[in-house]
Amino acid sequence: MKALRDFLDQMHPKFSKGGKLEKLYPLYEALDTFAYTPGEVAEGKTHVRDGMDLKRLMVTVVIALIPVTLMAMWNTGYQANLVLASKGIATVEDWRGAAMAAMGLAFDPNNFLSNFVYGALFFLPVYIVTMTAGGIVEGIFSTVRKHEINEGFLVSGLLYPLTLPATIPLWQVALGIIFGVIFAKEVFGGTGKNFLNVALASRAFLYFAYPAEISGDAVWVAVDGYTAATSLGLAAAEGVSAIPFTLNQAFMGDITGSMGETSVLACLIGA
């Protein structure tokens, strides 16, 4: 870590006022404050003086989301493997199937690792696209407005994928988060000034712009051509008695739905 600290200190003059890379200072500052404690401290008549800064608060929220994220990956793989096993399908002809084969994993719903890895192959691309597309927009606005890149996007960038179905097209993932960052956050001035939730605004945009990929019965299980309604969908269409899941399943989270919405237990652990 000392080597990184020395490197950042050496680069600081180039990004400071008058330096060759002055316009890119927000990008430098984002890396510096992500790795180390921000150099600025509260001054003046602040209401609270505390060791907790925005970075620590946001990192705390990210840590709280870890149980839900892990459950999202496991349950996504479990629901898919459950269907594949019931239909006698042993291979999947896409890059995820090739990755599973390369790791020597079968599509077995009784295998924890198989479920987790297969689910991760759906969740991680969504997360990576979210962080890349949203991060670029954040960087552009910070550079133009000459203000720091806040850690709040780390939270939005994790919440957003958790609200999506596993089958969502990646280009829609990018489009949704770009819309959310711009119109739910940056137009109001950025972190601390926006009254809309970036993750939910992004999802709402996709819901109204591309309803076929984010609603209905065909998007909740990551198996081509398979349909399965959510509990809310079944209750609305046929009544509560039509829900096939037990209360224990609903509490634990091994039911269909958006990747991060199914487990009450995981949410409570994070809370």
Tell where the protein language model's regions lie, with residue ranges.
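Short, amphipathic, aromatic/basic-enriched membrane-interface segments that mark the entry/exit
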Residues: 52, 121-124, 139-149, 165-168, ...
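Long hydrophobic alpha-helical segments that form multi-pass transmembrane helix bundles
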Residues: 189-268
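A generic, well-ordered mixed alpha/beta core segment in the N-terminal half of proteins
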Residues: 150-220
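Hydrophobic core segments of alpha-helical transmembrane domains in multi-pass membrane transport
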Residues: 61-75, 131-138, 162, 178-182, ...
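C-terminal ends of transmembrane helices
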Residues: 43-48, 133-146, 182-192, 269-271
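Hydrophobic alpha-helical transmembrane segments
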Residues: 58, 62, 124-128, 151-155, ...
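Structural signature of hydrophobic alpha-helical transmembrane segments
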Residues: 116-130, 167-176, 236, 255-264
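N-terminal signal-anchor module of multipass membrane proteins
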Residues: 1-123, 127
